[in-house]
Amino acid sequence: MQQPRVESDIIGAGEGPQRAVPWSAWIIRQDWVRWWVCHIPRSWTQWWNTSGWRQPLQRMLWGLEGTLYLLLALMLCHALFTTGSYLLSSLWPVVAVMWSHLLPAILLLVLSALPALLFAASFLLLFSTLLSLVGLLTSMTQPGYAQDLDQ
């Protein structure tokens, strides 16, 4: 089956929908390069190709970036501080009531953990003493350890 032939004029009217072209295609088209060569002075392209301008520009952009990050950090600190102080002022009665109930529980927890902590500390002290005694005894058994004290 043969397709019907469609007549078109010079701008392509009558050819139907064109296929989709990616947006990046305009960079690699020859028309863009030709326009660049014709309209941009050679001194500009030489300046663009030299690397002398890039380093100061990069330093300036890094400084600007650092300043913006510092400003952002200050704004975040200010927002957190103001929000936090507002929340603390509104939640202070709740915190006071919770603290009055939690303080005895925390004290009881600490006091009940004291015997275990004392046992662990005494065990570690005993263990380190035994290790140092073993080290002393093993070093005394070396042949070069015994010295004549009369000399």
From Swiss-Prot:
The chain crosses the membrane at residues 61-81, 85-105, 116-138. InterPro entries: TMEM239. Its main location: membrane. It is found in: Membrane. One of its GO terms (cellular component) is membrane. It is a multi-pass membrane protein. Keywords: Membrane, Transmembrane, Transmembrane helix. This is Transmembrane protein 239.
